[in-house]
Amino acid sequence: MSKRTIVDANTFFGFYPRRKVDSSLEALLQIMKENGVSKALTLSLKGVFYSYEEGNEETLRVCKNHRNLMPVATLDPRRFLGGRSEIESLLELGFKAFRLFPDVQGYPLNYSPVIEIFNCLDGLKAPLLISVGGRGDITAVSKLTCGKDFPVIIVGCFYSNLSEFIVSARKNKNLYVETHHLASPDSLEVLVNKVGADRIIFGSGTPLEYFQASYMMV
């Protein structure tokens, strides 16, 4: 039997200011090694809590030294003025995907700079991971990205808003869901039955979250 290839779409490294946790690069690499994770999309937490430009520089530097890490560029709409050229430059540097954190950085989804980022990504086919919070967020993301030509991966979907994702995903064929908060086996079964296994992206949130909690559900 061939060994399962594990790719984790949701990992981090760097200092996390909200609670005491070992979120160092070394911790991430050790968790990947212990659990047989072949590749991981990752980003520096500096880009989330401090400067997204400095965070992206650190992400790229680290990923160049570790071939099992794939760089994700953080974008902060509160400071984003570079337009499509900035996003194209990040892709040329080697970034594989983009990430928005409205839940952490405190901006609404129906926000002109966010809409500008969605428009800039259209046609580039690079995935966008976006964290959601309360009810209605998935609906808003789906409406704002429907018809655009890039994959949108919803991060932070719970069982309680699974129906919102399913209804939205039926209308928006570029919508996918990441798994780290889907903590019950039935949620994955429901997703497979309603939208198909190809719309489910494995992510753990490690090292901020416990890897096995996500992995055992898949």
Task: Show where each model-derived region lies.
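Alpha-helix N-cap/helix-start motif
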Residues: R18-V21, Y52, G83, N110, ...
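Active-site beta-loop-alpha junctions enriched in small/polar residues
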Residues: N10-Y16, L45-G47, T74-R78, F101-Q105, ...
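Structured loop/turn residues at beta-strand edges in well-structured enzyme cores
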Residues: R4, N35, R67, L93, ...
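Active-site gating/metal-coordination segments in enzymes
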Residues: K39, G47-L129, K171
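Conserved, mostly hydrophobic/aromatic
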Residues: N10, M32, T59, C63, ...
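An N-terminally biased module of ancient metal coordination in phosphate/nucleic-acid-related enzymes
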Residues: M1-E57
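A general structural detector for well-ordered alpha-helical segments in enzyme core domains, enriched
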Residues: S24-I31, G55-V62, E86-L90, P113-I117, ...
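Catalytic pocket-lining loop regions of alpha/beta-barrel enzymes
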Residues: A97, N110-F202, E209
